[in-house]
Structures are given as C-alpha cells and as structure tokens.
Amino acid sequence: MSLLQSALDFLAGPGSLGGAAGRDQSDFVGQTVELGELRLRVRRVLAEGGFAFVYEAQDLGSGREYALKRLLSNEEEKNRAIIQEVCFLKKLSGHPNIVQFCSAASIGKEESDTGQAEFLLLTELCKGQLVEFLRRVECKGPLSCDSILKIFYQTCRAVQHMHRQKPPIIHRDLKVENLLLSNQGTIKLCDFGSATTISHYPDYSWSAQKRAMVEEEITRNTTPMYRTPEIVDLYSNFPIGEKQDIWALGCILYLLCFRQHPFEDGAKLRIVNGKYSIPVNDTRYTVFHDLIRGMLKVNPEERLSIAEVVRQLQEIAAARNVNPKAPITELLEQNGGYGNSGPSRAQPPSGGPVNSSGVLALAEYDQPYGGFLDILRGGTERLFTNLKDTSSKVIQSVANYAKGDLDISYITSRIAVMSFPAEGVESAIKNNIEDVRLFLDAKHPGHYAVYNLSPRIYRASKFHNRVTECGWAVRRAPHLHSLYTLCRSMHAWLREDHRNVCVVHCMDGRAASAVAVCAFLCFCRLFSTAEAAVYMFSMKRCPPGIWPSHKRYIEYVCDMVAEEPITPHSKPMLVKSVVMTPVPLFSKQRNGCRPFCEVYVGEERVTTTSQEYDRMKEFKIEDGKAVIPLGITVQGDVLTIIYHARSTLGGRLQAKMASMKMFQIQFHTGFVPRNATTVKFAKYDLDACDIQEKYPDLFQVNLEVEVEPRDRPSRDVPPWENTSLRGLNPKILFSNREEQQDILSKFGKPELPRQPGSTAQYDAEAGSPEAEITESDSPQSSSTDTNHFLHTLDWQEEKDPETGVDNTSPKESQSNLIADGDGSEVSDEEEASCPSEERKPGAGEDTPRLAAGTRQQDLIFDVGMLAAPQEPVQPEEGVDLLGLHSEGDLRPAAPLQASGVQSSNTDLLSSLLEPSDASQVGPPGDLLGGETPLLLASPVSLLGVQSNLQGKVPDTVDPFDQFLLPSSSDTQPCSKPDLFGEFLNSDSVASSTAFPSTHSAPPPSCSTAFLHLGDLPAEPNKVIASSSHPDLLGGWDTWAETALPGPASMPVPEGTLFSSAGHPAPPGPNPSQTKSQNPDPFADLSDLSSSLQGLPAGLPAGSFVGTSATTHKSNSSWQTTRPTAPGTSWPPQAKPAPRASEQLRSHFSVIGAREERGVRAPSFAQKPKVSENDFEDLLPNQGFSKSDKKGPKTMAEMRKQELARDTDPFKLKLLDWIEGKERNIRALLSTLHTVLWDGESRWTPVSMADLVTPEQVKKQYRRAVLVVHPDKATGQPYEQSAKMIFMELNDAWSEFENQGSRPLF
C-alpha cells in the first residue's frame, strides 16, 4: 500500500472512506499514542488501504504534525513484510527526497484489541500526492519543461540513493502515485512495502516451477503497467535487478511529458516488445526523448543506469539554467499557494515549532486541511461543500467544548468532563493544568471539585486540594463500592451549595468518565436505564466506547436507587465451572481452542487454571462446548478472563506459553439471585472480544454457580448500607428549571429503549402494578427433574422482598453526609476515592423520578428452583393464565376453592411444572392438578400414576382438560407392586364420551407401583381418566364408546375382550398391554384396519379395539390417534388367531400373510396418502430415542437454516452451487445447469469428461459467459442472478489462468 495513496479521496464526501476505516476512525481518532519519547494525539484519518490506515497525528509536546501509518497483520508472512518495510525506510531515511522516518512500534495479537498484530510507522506529514497536483495543473495547460525536470530529477535522486546501498535496494513499485509533495514543495518517495534486495538471474537450468514461483512473487509486488519485459517474460532469461526501476522511471517521465502512460493497458506483448511511440509533433519535451528511449530498452543490460540518468539530467538542468534540487513552486503557485486566501490555518515555518495556544480546536476542525484547501478554489465548490459537511460531523462532537483551547464538555451546567490535565513536559498540549485551573477559577471560583478517575496523579494543590483520586483500573469496570461512593460524594458536594460543580476526568474523558457521569445521572434518578444516560453523554461530549460490563455496573446503580431498590446481598457464590457453547475458534486452524481462566476478586487474582501447555485440554468444534472447571468461592466484584493457550517452538524450548485473550466478564455477586444456578452471557455481553469470526453463531458463556445460604459480611461496611435514598432528586443536576426542562425534552421523554449492548430487555410500555407483582400459583418443587427442566429456561430475576426494606432512618444525619466526603469507607482494593475536604449537606428535595420504566436485571439467570405461589387474586382479569411472569416465595398454595378463581382462568402450566399439595385434591377447576409435574417427572413416575376412573364427568367441559384431570380423593395407592393388576381390574369402566382423534391423547397410566420395583418413593402419584379424557392403558374398553366416523361398525358382545382375529382372548393380561414383557413387539398389529384406518364407529362399551401409540419427537410418553381416513368401509373378516410360535419367530411378517389382510380395495380406487411417518406408530421406540428428522443435524445445516431466514433464495442457491467448488472452473461449469434461472435453454450441460484439456475448459467457459453475461440480461428479472453467476465464473477462470491452465490429467 502506498502512503497517502487515497488521501484526497476523502474530499469526495463522507462516503468515500470504507466501513472499516469509518469504524477505525471512531476507535482510533482522538486517542493518545506513545512512540518512544513522543506522545501523539491522533487527529483524523488521511487514507486507508488493504491492511493499513494513515492518520494525521500531532505531537503533544511540540505541536508538530506527523503521518501515522497503522498496519494490521494476521499472518507471519505479512509481519515479515511490514518489518522489512520499516527497516528499509529507517535505512534510507535522511535523504531529502525520501519521506522522513521518525519512529515505529508494534504489538502482538495478544495485546491488540483487533485480534491482529499492529505496527505503527511514524513519518513526516507531506502536503499530498503529486498526481493530484498534476491533475489540477494540467487542467490549465501542460507542465513546463523545467517543472518536469525538477520532479524527475528529485525522483531519480531518491532512486539513486536506494541503488547505492549495500546491497542495492530495489523499489519495484515506482509509480507516480508513490511520489508525494512535501510542505516545502520537494518530491518525496514513499511506500517501500514492495522493496527488496534480491535480484534474479534466470537461465536455462531454471525449472518451470521455479519460474512460476518467482513470477508470482514479483507479480504480487509490482503494478502491471510498470512491469518490465524481463518480468513479463521470464523465459527471455534477462536478469531481474535494479534495472527494473529504470524502466519504471522511463514510464514516469513519459507520463509527465505526454500525460499518458506508454503502456496504458498493461498489454504484455507491447511490454515485451517495447512497443511505445513518442508523439512525432512534440517539440516541447524533445530534450527528454533520448532519455526516455534509453530507459525503455527491452534488454535491461542496455538500459541506462541510475547514475547515467542523473548525470544527463544535471546536464539538461545546467543547459537550461535550472536548479533541479529547488522546490517545485510552480505547482503550489498554480494551485493557490500555501494559504494565500481566506482564513485558513497559517503554515508554520520549516523546522519551526507550532504555537499550540493560538486557535481553538473548533477552528482547526472548521478548516482541517489548512492551506491545502486553497487548491480547491475555483470551479470546485462542490468538493468544498462536501468537505464542510464532513467537518460539521466532527464539530458536533466538540460543539459543547468550553471556550479557549481546553478539551472540556459540560454534560449539565453542574457536571463537566475533561481529559487529563497535564503538567511539566506536557504543558504545551491542550489541557494544560494551569490553563484548566485558570478556567475553572474564573468560571467557578471556589465552587468546583475535581474527580480524577485515572491511575495517574498530579499535585492536588493545583486545584486547591479539592481533588478526589479514584485510581480506577483501565480496561475494566470500576468496583461497585468505589462507583457508589463516588456518586455519594458528588451528590453531597452538589447539595452543599447550589453553585458547586463537579469536574470529572480520566485520561481521555471517554470510557471511565462516561461510567462515572452516567452512573451519577442514574443515581440522582434522572434516568432509570443505562442506555438513556449513555445516549445523553454521547450527545453532550462524544461516543464513550464503553464495554458491556460498564453498562452492567451503571445498571447496578439504577437497581440500587429504584423505586423498589435492590440491595446487593452479602452471600458468597461458588463458581463451579465456565461453559462456552459452541466452542470458540481461536486455534490457528480455526477449529477449536485450548482455554484457561483467571479469576480476580477486586484487584486480587484468586485462581488460574493455567498449566503446562500439554496438560491443558484442547476443545474442538465437534465437542459442542468447552468446559473449564473452577470450584472457587467468590464475593463482590468478580473479573473472569478467558485466554487461549498457544505454543510456539521457542516457547517449547524455554518452557513458555503464549496466551491470547479471548474475552473477559465482570459482574458483582450481590446481584446474582439466591436461587440461581447459571449466569448466562451472550456474545454481546462480553468484554475485550476478538474478531467476530472467532465466535460462532449463538455463542454464549455460562457460569455454573451456587449461591451459599449464609451471609459473609465484608471487613468494611458497604457504602449502600447506610445511605438514605430520600434525598435523591434530579433537580440537583441543574442550575435552573429551564435547563432541566430542556434536558427533559431532549433526553427524558420517553426513556430510550435498550440496545443490544445490554442483556436486560427494556419494555417500552410500563407494566401495571398488578402485572408486576403477579407471582406463581404453584408451590415450590424440590424435584431433581424439575431442576433439570428449569435449567434450560430463562426466567426473570427473582426480587427478594427483603431488598425493598429501607434499613436507614428517614432523615440522614449531617455526620453521615459528611462521611460521604471522606475516605473512611474505602476498601483495601481501592485508592482513596473521596475528596479531602469535608462537605456540608444541603437541604434535600424529594420529587419523583424523571423517567420511570420497568427494568429487568442485566444478566439472565437459570433458576433451578421455582418461586412460591402468589396470594389469591380477586379480579378474574388479573390472573396469570400461563404463569410466565410470576415471582414467588415459599408460602404454601391456597386451594382454588378459597381463591374464588374460575376454572377457565387458572394457571394452566403450574401443574406441568409444580406438584400440588399431597393432601388436597383439585376440583374440576384444577385443570392440571396432580401430585407430580408431568413434564418434569421421570419415566418411572410417569408410568406410575393410577388410572382408575372415579366420579362422573363434570358438567362443563373445559377445553384444556384434554391434558390431564385431577386425581380423586378416595383413590388409594397400592400397598405392594402389582404390575398387571390394574390392567385386569374389572372395575375400570369408562363412561360414554366423544374423544376426537385430532386431539392429543393423554399420557399412559397404570398402577401406582408399576415399574417401581419396591425401592422407589411410595408417594401417591395419581391421574384419573375421565370420560372426555380416556385412559389408554387403564383398560382397553375405555375407547370402546368413542364415536368416530370410519368404516362400518363391527358388532362385538359387551364386556368381552377380543383378540385381533375376532375370537375371545384367553384369560390373563393382553399381549398388547404388557409390551415390556412380550418378546414380539408387533404381535398385536396384524389387523391393519384398526391401526391405520382409525376406529370403527358405534362400538358398544367393553369391546376391544386395537389402537396405535405415536411416539413424539420429544421422546415423551404422550400418545395420539390418527384421524380416520375416508374410503371404502372394510367389513370384518374372521382370521385365525396368531400362534405363539409365529409370534416368537425372529423373522416374521409385519403385514402378515395374504389371508390375514382382509379384503383388498379395488386397484382403481383412491389409495390413502401415506407419509414417511405414518408407520411410526406401528414400531414403538423399544427404549431407543430418535432425533428429529426435520431439525438440522450438522453445524453446517444450522448455519444454512440461520442464513435462510434473511437471505435471498437465489443467493442461497448460488451459495449451495459454489460450496466446495470455490474457484474451481471445471466443477462450476459441470454444475452450471443446476443454478441457471428458469427458462434458460441455451446452455447444454457438460460433464467433467468434456473439461479435461485447457482448450476444452476455455471453450466451455466462453459458452457459459455468452449465456450468463450481465449485459444480455439487462432489464430482465434474472439480471442480478446473471451478475452473481458471471462473477463466480470469472473469478474461477482467473484462478485457472493463474495456476497455469493445467490439464485435468
């Protein structure tokens, strides 16, 4: 990349910079960079390239401006190339025609925030590219011969300096775009990224492979138009060395003279043969004709050397009486000079220091390009307008800065934010500590206090000893007690006098200052969410660039001062493990990671899992998740940092290991609910993340935790324990009512919705008080299955009623308020974070909050135990039907009879998730009453429920009682295990009812002790079948009276069990009812008429009907019946009962013999439609589970399914087409017919056999281009499709040519 290659493209408007540069500008511009002894402030972006950005930076000490080149690299080869470029520039620096090297620095991937190695290269700042000056000058006429002489001579002097090195340095990328014009008007050569000291001498001994390798390397570092004949044709066996720079100089001289390149199209044949032409009628530049011919010789040995070129130029200059080393003032004069019009910034004298106290930063932003803007005068008003539009966006971020040259912003009239006030050597920069003191003393004499959040300190006497040193660590959120103490201290200072102001600063006045100010705004109840406060800070100063943990701690402050405050508890928390799902891709192969963890509590590191490299487990993407076991107990501010371990050869020899930070998480344990088992963090909740490609989709981090039941009081009393919230009022932030109304109109109504930076979701409409206090109707469950089920659910954080109690007296004493200002409550981990002076409190004001809104906790918790039920709710409309927004305690559930709630408004899901009281029996209103929550019960308990039918059908049929009905109070459990007693119980009688086949059937039920085998708990688990909800396994006669449309009814005597053949079955348990002991699982499936075609209608009670049980994909024990298929009625046909020997055969026919199938329907009749799942009900699971066929089975399918939601269907089709065939021209051509649009008939599919030789590939490629060329599809609906196909084929063809157009065999 060339230095300042596209600097002036910025003038075209704000859209000229790419997205990456725009993001980098917001992240890097404004920062302070230290390079050696220089401290630089990055001011703006000048240009961007493939992997580098160029900024304008200013030395804070001298005010001198530099060009700062920031190069990013993620490969070792690029690292070596960048280091070589720096070495060459450093070696060549000092020549008057080579850009001046100043300093350089680098950091590795592990230390960089971008996940790539970063290199900083500091050089002198030039005025611009020569090519841009030439374009403007040539609009008025051709260049003079003297100007060309100066430009070319100075360029050759720079090349001569390179060739004089030992060994000679070859630039290899000389072109007019790499020539800069300095502020003094001289030529500066730049961009040594392609330079080398290696020459090549090909001969007949070189193999084709070696020639191809050399050609590829040279092609990668040269520009096509400037390539020499020996490079284009390596088989000419000409030496490739310094003479290639002479050829490039000849092209530059030709371009300067005739305003066009001699090989404009880069045609190889013209270059190899040296076919260029000098205009015959040219008389202006005849003095250069021989020089051009001497430099553009095809044979490099015949070309002039750089010494000969310089000597001829000196002779020409002497003949024309021109000093070739003099500045090229003609370019500057014709372009408007250095700044001879308008109020543009004055150009400093050469080598002289810049007076930094002259103009305000606003003036610099108003004219950010200084005198260079003058060259745009005359006919370029549009460019100047775009420049002003671009500058206005920068001005917005500093529009509220104080007058003078200070970087200070007023968030409100009583809260100011500034950058670090410097002294000593840094006294020349903007925020000089003396200037800051004079400004504050003049504007707020004796009524300002300074809060220093940075770890650096200065003399507090500069600000009359009213300085609070907080000492917050960088790149992490502040400790909660320090943040809360700071808010109390600022509040006490503002209350002391209505003229008092708070001045907050960190190093740059961004992240740390934003956390302090936003937390204080929420502390004073101006806002109730972090997002609203951060938005106000961004508008009043600049985007703070804070991390998710910063927002999390601001949310903590919001919780602690809410209408119903949440006080952090003092219970220790056991962190069992850290689980990352899916596995992040941090290995070099991007297929997994080798993680280890460090945990800090406060400033102390309490544990690390780092071991020897080989002893740490490596997780692959196939593992699905990465688990780091911890097992440590923490309390307070917890910082968890996850690293990826890397091993290098040198590290192995020295027993060292390189680590790369993957992410970090910070939170406070006091806000983790007492019954939480998992703390979830999504990808956007993590701090210090690497590039997004390393984190798979839906990546999240789970902390498996357990909060201990007992409190562990800390050594120091937390500051929130003795704080009264009654005096908190947003009026204290403003000087008058008008200011408050203005802020309120801009930022307070309505409060801004939450952004993805915080997990807590914001509800735009505040919920009613009734909805907020609604709790669960179900008692607490202690079932382990319940815990397992709820572990997969995300619930709102449980609010403890204890946190709503105010432990302080209504009035706070003056001593307590004064204590806010001293350092008595500072913990051991923090620096003194309170003002040194004592402050007297002012009168408290009690007004409602500015903007109240419902809030949720910043973290998502998996609650292992559900909350207790709510008290009875009187109005029917307020009942929580689904129990999804409920919170609870440990109080027992009140009976529904006492609550007076109708059955239709009962919590419908509580019984699925909670057991009811064992002593009470639900009436018909208790729709899901049962002993054990069915969705959470184990398979044993599901099969152990009783199935006797007792009582009668309720008068009102509830639409939800298809799930289950409550057990009766007079049902007694069995005294001992009886596996089949319930099946043979003659008391099981079903009442007549209609059960539609489209409804879901109930879960199977049997005796209480079925499969318990005597060693399971004897708690009665009872579910009773009703007439509207028959029991499938409680007795086969239950289904007898179900009236369904279907085939003709089959008369059967009432009360008799029949086998599938129509004969009376022998006494004993039915084989279909005892499937667990029957060796033939298909013995009862011979009658397909009953299992596939539905149930006959009108059967009397007590008759036997074979039914089918459909096992759902969720592996639960629910059963359903198939709807009756319409068609010809099947008359009953007597079949012999199957013999036992046939049932016990290992190879039997599921369908049976022909004589067992009944009468076949005519072949011409309409056949029933059979799907792939229709026969699943014939084959039970037999203890095996089956995955969902409709769901994705691989990670690739999951990604495709996610991509298909918001991607164009044809683009998906195109992605499927190129998958596995990227840039493979043969594979793409052979499958082209699969991706063409409908109606395209010109393309004839070809096979791989038609694409063996390069000629065949070329022929088919041209045919394909004729079919899919976008020009032929203009205006057609498939125009976009043609473009995408054409681009893929074109890229594949280019790759095919680059690889040498090799045959297939």
From Swiss-Prot:
SMART domains: DnaJ (SM00271), PTEN_C2 (SM01326), S_TKc (SM00220). Residues 822-832 have a biased composition (Acidic residues). One of its GO terms (molecular function) is cyclin binding. Residues 332-354, 747-856, 1044-1141 are annotated as: Disordered. The modification N-acetylserine is found at S2. It is found in: Cytoplasm, Perinuclear region; Golgi apparatus, trans-Golgi network; Cell junction, Focal adhesion; Cytoplasmic vesicle, Clathrin-coated vesicle. The modification Omega-N-methylarginine is found at R1122. The modification Phosphoserine is found at S2, S16, S454, S768, S781, S809, S824, S827, S938, S1171. Associates with cyclin G and CDK5. Seems to act as an auxilin homolog that is involved in the uncoating of clathrin-coated vesicles by Hsc70 in non-neuronal cells. Expression oscillates slightly during the cell cycle, peaking at G1. May play a role in clathrin-mediated endocytosis and intracellular trafficking, and in the dynamics of clathrin assembly/disassembly. This is Cyclin-G-associated kinase. It comes from Rattus norvegicus. The lineage of its organism: Eukaryota, Metazoa, Chordata, Craniata, Vertebrata.
